[in-house]
Amino acid sequence: MISFNPVVARPHSFSAKPICSAFHTTGATAATTRRRFSPTSANVSAKQIVEHVVLVRVKTEVEHSKINDMVNNLYNLSSLPQVLHLTTGPVLRTQSPTLSFTHLLHSRYESTSDLEEYNTHPLHLSAVKNFLFPVIDDIMVADWIADDFAGSVEVGPGSIIRVKLLKLKEGLSENERTEIVDVTKRLKQKISMIDQLTVGENIVQARTKGFSIASIGVFGGLGAVHALDAQSAALNDQKDGVRGFVDDIVVVDYAVPANTLIK
């Protein structure tokens, strides 16, 4: 059985590359979020979006002002025209037997080409090189396509985002990988407090640490998350459906704040 005791990994050094998308080898005392208001960011049904999640661990010795600069500069990326939604800041908790993260960035795009343009934009490259990489010692990235996305692309203040990443055993068949995705998707039908759920295979080519299945659950607040955790039967059904295929799991909870910059 996989336990969830966070451990501290060894520090890493990072080259000045964009945080990777499917095409690249590639928070703070408060958190920030911003959404682009347009017809495409309203409620939608049965459409495709691209999820982008970056998890980082800030070095323990970093000054708070530099952490704030990191979060603010990542937040400013929400002004880019490709971004439908972006939120970033410190995580509530990380559950993992092997990894520990302090900050999260979550954003959404209409297509992989939009994500590609975001990743190669000079504002993004500058934020990563000058404000992100100098203050962190670990990073993991997950991008995936949600083909059956429904609801709002915006995740409102007060919501809780739960990111779950799975590292699969080697040698699994395509049918087995598909079953893992389908088992996770079925959670939305079984558990009413999940407002939104997307899941898919990680299309990133680097900085994945071998985690190839990613999902995001959106909840109305901490009360909904606590209610989910109390529903052991439904959760155990999901765990039983994937346990034999999984080597490692990372679960990160994050509270979406109001869209204010850190000072």
Q: What do these predicted regions represent?
A:
Residues 2-106, 110-120, 134-236, 240-263:
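Short S/T/G/P-rich N-terminal loop/turn motif that feeds into the first structured element of a domain
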Residues 120-128:
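A short mixed-secondary-structure module that forms the rim of ligand-binding clefts
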